[in-house]
């Protein structure tokens, strides 16, 4: 089946199998490897991308579901002016180590900052619950996001 979508601001038209996952489409068909495969059950957040501005787990989202949508991967976010702010905050607060979770984390945080939902420490924790990090212990991540959101 043919799908047409925008990926990181570029129009893409491709044939996909009905069962092809968005994660596989991005990685295998488009060579965008920032979204990572890890749990395959929407738990870890490593595969997070934005579809029409909202974070989705691309490991459980069909490529066909993205037909007509705007998909943003970490590669696309890195081209945006706001990426530098995210990168600086995560670096300043030592919010990353191995980096495996970082693309999904940054995409989630970007969408949440844009929505204005991050107004308390508890809200930050709730919103990041779908993004697991095995290295940092979360303190630096929570500090970076609080800094970005202006939450004390």
Predicted regions and their residues:
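Signature of N-terminal electron-transfer/Fe-S-associated modules in redox systems
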Residues: 1-152
